[in-house]
Amino acid sequence: MRPFLLAGLAALALAGCQKSTETAITRTTANGVDTLYSKRTVVDGVARFECMASRSGQCHYLLLDPACRPDAACARAPIRSFALAVGTTQEFRDLPKGFAQCVSEDRKEQCHRE
């Protein structure tokens, strides 16, 4: 009986140790070639951005307040704007939970298209 109890407690302990993870991939292609390829992961509040391909040589990011949506105008200014060269990554630990993003091969002031 005791081994079953210990095994059950170990399983519960491991279940409590799982990290909160979110992944988003943005990828566009033209004629079978990546024009933009970006990956964002958020693990336990640490957001990691990775620029894997961009026709311009850089991935340009806008990070938005959780109340904003990338497909609509928002009165609030972006939380952060930055660019990454292809093959590089950037981490942030201070972003609000639920932030939105848009990424493009060229610098933009807003995410939505007019």
Question: At which residue positions do the language-model features occur?
Answer:
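Post-signal peptide N-terminal segment of mature Sec-exported envelope proteins
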Residues: I25-V43
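Sec-dependent N-terminal signal peptides
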Residues: L5-L12
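Terminal connector regions
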Residues: F92-E114
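Positively charged n-region of N-terminal signal peptides that target proteins for export
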Residues: M1-P3
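N-terminal Sec signal peptide cleavage junction
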Residues: G16-C17
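Intrinsically disordered, low-complexity Pro/Gly/Ser/Thr-rich segments with frequent PxxP/GP/PP motifs
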Residues: P70-A100
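Post-signal-peptide N-terminal segment of Sec-exported extracytoplasmic proteins
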Residues: K39-A67
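Extracellular/mature segments of secreted proteins
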Residues: C59-H60, P66-R69, R76, S81-L84, ...
